[in-house]
């Protein structure tokens, strides 16, 4: 009896089982990488909004506000000129299930409007911003002199 070269059924089943095991281990780490990427995108998007508000307040020599609403956060001048169209200059949209919370530690009252001001000198009110969404959560302290973020909490899901 001559033996044919090839794989037996047991060897094929064993190879498929090992492949499925490796795939099962890779999928959770892949979802973690995707969640981290999405969380980083939200942090970068908000930091871009902050940078644009600061740059415009200095360039136009007038205060700018970052204003919170339910589904978005916008940057706009504090006061519009008479001939100026009333619209936001930059926007950070929030997806369903995402929450962006503003805390102003130097505010005179506990209940303050959800507005963060940038003055024409380039300084801003010190702020703590917290984000929570499906991809994870982050928190950042923004320095009053530079308006740059120091990330204090970053946890992808």
Residues covered by each model-derived region:
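N-terminal single-pass transmembrane signal-anchor helix
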Residues: 1-30
